Amino acid sequence: NGEKMKFHGVSIHHDNGALGAEENYKATYRKLKLLKDMGVNSIRTTHNPASPQLLDAAASLGLLVQEEAFDTWYGGKKEYDYGRFFEEEATHPEAKAGDFWSDYDLRTMIERGKNNPAIFMWSLGNEVSEANGDAHSLKTIKRLLERVKEVDDSRFVTMGMDQFRFGDGSGGHEKIADLLDVVGLNYSEDNIDGIRKRHPKWRLYGSETSSATRTRDSYFRPDKEWVGDNRRVRNFEQSDYGNDRVPWGKTATASWTADRNRL
């Protein structure tokens, strides 16, 4: 709407606590309302298309949504995950001739959501290791981008990429990122200055950052940060002070500091 707005976002999965993966509009609305009251203004659906209930609740609450299509491409992350079908011929009666399942599933996600005012970006994947800039991955990203723009050319297309956190962040994956409208950085705050220097025209945002986790009512000294060698000492619990993190992430404070210093 012509107004600059900073993302205060969260990545959320499709479960609702004790309800598990069973969708319930009231539970989803409650979850999003709590997040909004906390200061959240945007959501990334990790790492799959959202339920209609979540999209409706987000629109009702005025929250922005980045809808994510895939957690893997053809490489797969688990033996029986979506990677088995990514480049398999789609057999759905509404699939187009020559469609892979990834074509059909991506197209139907966008056709469903293109008129929802909450959606502001489409994501083509999360931490896709095979998106490394080789010929196969470049052909794939161009195909997926074409599928998106055929249906909706009004929204930006992005990915959540973790390859930028290794070394100085450079590599073949930059060829993939260069084709995106917006580049999502997963756990790559330490390299953001170098990325900006190499690619001054890229639009960047933190698609996945802190991964700060807590065990309710379990407290450990604030000066002690969770690391791999003290898990058993803590009975595999994490501090409710907010000073713990997953091995690949940062505490919330560390992520906010990196963001604050670049305002």
Task: Identify the role of each PLM range.
Residues 184-189, 193-263:
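Active-site core of glycosidic bond-cleaving carbohydrate-active enzymes
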